[in-house]
């Protein structure tokens, strides 16, 4: 993980929002570690909203509407699912402190979810933080094929419609790169972030 990181003795929701506004975000070493540290990558993952790409096969799946998509319906369930250990994700950086902080941000109107439902079953989702005209994606999970991908498609559509200018993915992965995610040097990211923070806080 290239970039700076520093431990924090204590974080409040207001401090957390301030950190996002200057390019920091929190992580924990593991779910069982109560400590949190700040991360500021040298290369920041950004998914340009005007260059979002989906494959033909995924576009076809989206048109079939295999899941009901809901927004901000089950925040606690989404963040709990994102924190679960799976075969592809044997450890998690989401500890109880982070879960509590983001639940408070949800109550404040700054944390949001996109959820895929199959009947009464939550089968995929993602959560993140909105501030100014920026959305900071935190984590996602999937229990059915393409569920989290479809949530991402709906997230981008919603952000575009609401006038958001920045979708921050923190880091890039090969998975996110297929959607158009790029690595942005810290100095260039700071300019994108500053512009997004000058905007009034947009309603998600």
Swiss-Prot record:
Gene Ontology CC entries for this record: cytoplasm
EC number: 2.3.2.6
Chief location of this protein within or outside the cell: cytoplasm
GO biological process, one term: protein catabolic process
Annotated localization: Cytoplasm
Domain of life: Bacteria
Protein name, per record: Leucyl/phenylalanyl-tRNA--protein transferase
Gene3D superfamilies (UniProt xref): Leucyl/phenylalanyl-tRNA-protein transferase, C-terminal domain
GO molecular function: leucyl-tRNA--protein transferase activity
PANTHER family per record: LEUCYL/PHENYLALANYL-TRNA--PROTEIN TRANSFERASE (PTHR30098), LEUCYL_PHENYLALANYL-TRNA--PROTEIN TRANSFERASE (PTHR30098:SF2)
Catalysed reactions, semicolon-separated: N-terminal L-lysyl-[protein] + L-leucyl-tRNA(Leu) = N-terminal L-leucyl-L-lysyl-[protein] + tRNA(Leu) + H(+); N-terminal L-arginyl-[protein] + L-leucyl-tRNA(Leu) = N-terminal L-leucyl-L-arginyl-[protein] + tRNA(Leu) + H(+); L-phenylalanyl-tRNA(Phe) + an N-terminal L-alpha-aminoacyl-[protein] = an N-terminal L-phenylalanyl-L-alpha-aminoacyl-[protein] + tRNA(Phe)
One Pfam family it belongs to: Leu_Phe_trans
Keywords from the UniProt entry: Acyltransferase, Cytoplasm, Transferase
Task performed by this protein: Functions in the N-end rule pathway of protein degradation where it conjugates Leu, Phe and, less efficiently, Met from aminoacyl-tRNAs to the N-termini of proteins containing an N-terminal arginine or lysine.
Stated family: Belongs to the L/F-transferase family.
NCBIfam families named in the record: aat
Principal EC category: transferase
Entry keyword 4Fe-4S: no
UniProt cross-references to HAMAP family, sorted A to Z: Leu_Phe_trans
């Amino acid at each position: 993980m290239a970039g700076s990181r520093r431990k924090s003795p204590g974080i409040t929701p207001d401090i957390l929002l301030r950190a996002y506004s200057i390019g920091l975000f929190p992580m924990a070493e593991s779910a069982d570690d109560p400590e949190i540290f700040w991360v500021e990558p040298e290369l920041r993952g950004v998914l340009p909203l005007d260059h979002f790409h989906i494959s033909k096969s995924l576009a076809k799946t989206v048109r079939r509407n295999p899941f009901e998509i809901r927004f901000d319906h089950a925040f606690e369930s989404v963040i709990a699912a994102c924190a679960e250990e799976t075969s592809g994700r044997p450890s998690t950086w989401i500890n109880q402190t982070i879960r509590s902080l983001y639940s408070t941000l949800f109550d404040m109107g700054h944390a949001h979810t996109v959820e895929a439902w199959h009947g009464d079953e939550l089968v995929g989702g993602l959560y993140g933080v909105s501030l100014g005209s920026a959305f900071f994606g935190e984590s996602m999970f999937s229990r059915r094929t393409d569920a989290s991908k479809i949530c991402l498609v709906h997230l981008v559509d919603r952000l575009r419609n609401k006038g958001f200018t920045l979708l921050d993915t923190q880091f890039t992965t090969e998975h996110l790169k297929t959607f158009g995610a790029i690595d942005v040097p810290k100095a260039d990211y700071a300019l994108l972030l500053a512009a997004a923070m000058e905007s009034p806080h947009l309603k998600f």
